[in-house]
Amino acid sequence: MGKRVYLGLGSNLGNKERIVRKAIDKIGERVGAVVAMSSFYKTAPWGYQSVHTFCNAAISVDTDLSPEEVLFTVQEIERELGSKKHRERDGSYVDRLIDIDLLDYDGLVLDTHSLVLPHPYMHKRTFVMTPLVEIAPQWVHPVGGKTATELLEGLRNEK
């Protein structure tokens, strides 16, 4: 397998853990070998109000797919598992069965109309960084140069 990819997963509807596990299984079948998987974390919604908490996790995958192919495949998996939309027309977030974010593709920095790498908000989200630190504490943000552990410590110090 050629490239190491980090993905963040979250669900706040239905049987959350089962849905996240099913997404991870499908990723393993279609994107590449799942090398590491974090624990599941119960977190509050970010960027909007909801009574539904999230189940979040992170995984690392070794893949031969291109970044765009990874993105297309995880979006296809989201649709297969019942996710319809992640935002309202006004841009506000909504509850969802599954959300899969491509966080990092082997340290690639990319900014196209369909994909920005690394994920532009990952370093601002505790629910992303906590599971990422569990599986890859020494991962280095390709733009900021800080490790996952340093980024998470910074988020915790902001609070």
Question: Which functions belong to the PLM regions below?
Answer:
Residues 2-7, 13-97, 107:
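Nucleotide and nucleotide-moiety/phosphate-recognizing core
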Residues 4-6, 10, 127, 141:
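Short glycine- and Lys/Arg-enriched binding-loop motifs that mark or flank ligand-binding interfaces
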